């Protein structure tokens, strides 16, 4: 896959369009990113009638699509036990749109 080469504003930033990339260092501590991860847990709880409690964001990856697909590894508490889950959230910030695409136990 090619880097953005023409007027997309991404040239020289190392962003690979369409490819899943590790987010910049420290992104797991970014408040907006944490809110998206909390959203993923809340959406999963609502859909699955679960009671997972967000603990922390462990890993963040992202993919530039029509918006941004965020790939999270999230530590949660379930009945007092800490567990890891993987979530995928699609966001189009300019439309105030976010949607949980996937939420599953980490492999």
From Swiss-Prot:
Keywords: Plant defense, Protease inhibitor, Thiol protease inhibitor. The record marks 18 as: Reactive site. Induction: Up-regulated by dark and cold shock, anaerobiosis and upon seed imbibition. Repressed by gibberellic acid treatment in aleurones, but not in leaves. Not affected by abscisic acid treatment. GO terms for biological process: defense response. Signal peptide: none annotated. It comes from the Eukaryota. This is Cysteine proteinase inhibitor. A motif (Secondary area of contact) lies at residues 63-67. Changing residue 68 to G: Increased cystatin activity. Inhibits papain, ficin, cathepsin B and, to a lesser extent, chymopapain, but is inactive against bromelain. Inhibits the growth of pathogenic fungi. Regulated by the DOF transcription factors SAD (activator) and BPBF (repressor). Belongs to the cystatin family. Phytocystatin subfamily. It holds the Pfam family SQAPI. Expressed in embryos, developing endosperms, leaves, roots, flowers and pollen grains. Residues 18-107 form the Cystatin domain. PANTHER family: CYSTATIN FAMILY MEMBER, CYSTEINE PROTEINASE INHIBITOR 2. GO terms for molecular function: cysteine-type endopeptidase inhibitor activity.
């Amino acid at each position: 896959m090619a880097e953005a080469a023409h007027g997309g504003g991404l040239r020289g930033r190392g962003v690979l369009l369409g490819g899943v990339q590790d987010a910049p260092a420290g992104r797991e501590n970014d408040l907006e990113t944490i809110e998206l991860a909390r959203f993923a847990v809340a959406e999963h709880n609502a859909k699955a009638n679960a009671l997972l409690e967000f603990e922390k964001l462990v890993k963040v990856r992202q993919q530039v699509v029509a918006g941004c697909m965020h790939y999270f590894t999230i530590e949660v508490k379930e009945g007092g036990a800490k567990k890891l889950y993987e979530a995928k959230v699609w966001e189009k910030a300019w439309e105030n749109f976010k949607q949980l695409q996937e939420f599953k136990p980490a492999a």
